[in-house]
A protein has these predicted regions:
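Catalytic center-proximal scaffold of phosphoryl-transfer enzymes
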Residues: 1-220
Length: 220
């Protein structure tokens, strides 16, 4: 699932948090090549080149980084802070054998270094545990941060008013996809699910008039 919105689609609450008034959605179950087409088509539809800055928030997955590098090489990429916190916490729990005080201290230190832009200290801290074998079920934090080291300047991102977390995508997964596809007793083929997801994206993007026109033109 991909979400598109601009500064014009947001307003600030009294507590300075942002609310997104309007979002555009694309979604697809299957290979990345088809998803890339949908993402780029939506960006073109929204005339992405007219915006001063193009910003992507993601969980740092390799396929997403590669897709953005290919389609939007000028874009600013942000590693979702809350994914980083979660991965740091899980890594620390393994390293420190569930000692929560040490886990919290380690997590706060890593995130603090991100905010102070002391990336060399992140590398120095993680180097202490380079000989520890990490289970595949746990994020290899040194590799994860090395791959995303140019996407963790959270002080600058927040100063610019950009989102640093993917809460919008997490909540939209529930409202756009799961709310319709995961009701009691439902079973879907991939093809059928993709048809329904497309309709859901059009509905939640306030483009249902386009679906009505397609149906009307087909009937008449």
């Amino acid at each position: 699932l991909g979400i598109f919105f601009s500064d014009d689609d947001m307003y600030k609450r009294k507590d300075k948090s942002n609310i997104i008034n309007h979002k555009e959605y694309v979604s697809y179950i299957g290979n990345v090549d088809t998803f890339k087409i949908l993402v780029f088509a939506k960006a073109v539809e929204l005339k992405y080149w007219e915006y001063e800055s193009i910003v992507f928030i993601s969980d740092g997955a390799t396929w997403l980084r590669n897709m953005i590098d290919e389609l939007f090489p000028e874009a600013i990429q942000i590693l979702d802070k809350f994914h980083l916190i979660e991965n740091t916490y899980d890594y620390a729990k393994f390293i420190f054998n569930e000692d929560i005080k040490k886990v919290e201290k380690f997590k706060d230190k890593i995130i603090g270094y991100c905010y102070s832009r002391e990336y060399n200290l992140i590398a120095k801290e993680l180097k202490k545990y380079k000989d520890v074998t990490i289970p595949k079920t746990i994020c290899n934090l040194p590799v994860y941060l090395e791959n995303n080291k140019n996407k963790i300047d959270y002080s600058t991102y927040e100063h610019n008013g950009w989102f640093v977390g993917s809460g919008a995508i997490e909540s939209s997964n529930k409202t756009v996809v799961q709310l319709r596809l995961k009701q009691a007793g439902m079973r879907w083929s991939i093809e059928g699910a993709n048809y329904m997801i497309t309709l859901r994206c059009m509905w939640e993007s306030n483009h249902w008039d386009k679906i009505e026109k397609i149906v009307t033109d087909y009937i008449y």
